[in-house]
């Protein structure tokens, strides 16, 4: 966290608080079955807001030279125990550029296989949930999922999927 002395467009000087964060990733783990598509979500306690929330698997590593796909595969395995046959980078977003300079890579994970998770100490209470697409969308609309990154990633995925279907 830093405070920069800035000069605004009108010439006034001021202080601007900035949170410096390493890149992160968010993963849409989609399990396509004859019964439909399902997503894997994680539920965990978020200290900053003092409550448990459901969201897509996401996070970052404090390693300078990590490839985004490697980070996404690692976060998926760490939090859910899932591995993906295919990872597709859908886009890169800025999470909250009003106060933070962190970028987030949005990945689609397909061809999922189950394995053992490898959670960090702060993730020991994390729970994994498999939900249908209809349930996930209902959760976004009724406020059970309030994570802006999960909502944005889903919107990006829907646009990507529609454009691929229109080929």
Predicted stretch roles:
Residues 1-28, 34:
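Acidic, metal-coordinating catalytic segment for phosphate/diphosphate chemistry
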Residues 151-167:
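Short, amphipathic C-terminal "tail helix"
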Residues 14, 23-26, 31, 59-149:
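Unchanged
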């Amino acid at each position: 966290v830093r405070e920069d002395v800035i000069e605004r467009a009108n010439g006034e000087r001021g202080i601007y608080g900035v949170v410096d964060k390493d890149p992160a990733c968010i993963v849409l783990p989609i399990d396509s079955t004859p019964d439909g598509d399902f997503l894997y979500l994680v539920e965990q306690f978020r200290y900053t807001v003092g409550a448990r929330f459901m969201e897509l698997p996401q996070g970052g590593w404090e390693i300078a030279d990590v490839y985004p796909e490697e980070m996404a595969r690692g976060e998926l395995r760490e939090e859910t125990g899932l591995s993906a046959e295919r990872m597709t980078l859908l886009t890169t977003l800025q999470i909250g550029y009003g106060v933070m300079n962190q970028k987030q890579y949005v990945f689609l994970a397909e061809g999922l296989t189950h394995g053992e998770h490898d959670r960090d100490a702060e993730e020991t209470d994390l729970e994994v949930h498999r939900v249908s697409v209809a349930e996930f969308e209902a959760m976004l609309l009724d406020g059970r999922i309030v994570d802006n990154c999960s909502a944005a990633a889903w919107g990006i995925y829907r646009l990507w999927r529609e454009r691929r279907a229109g080929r």
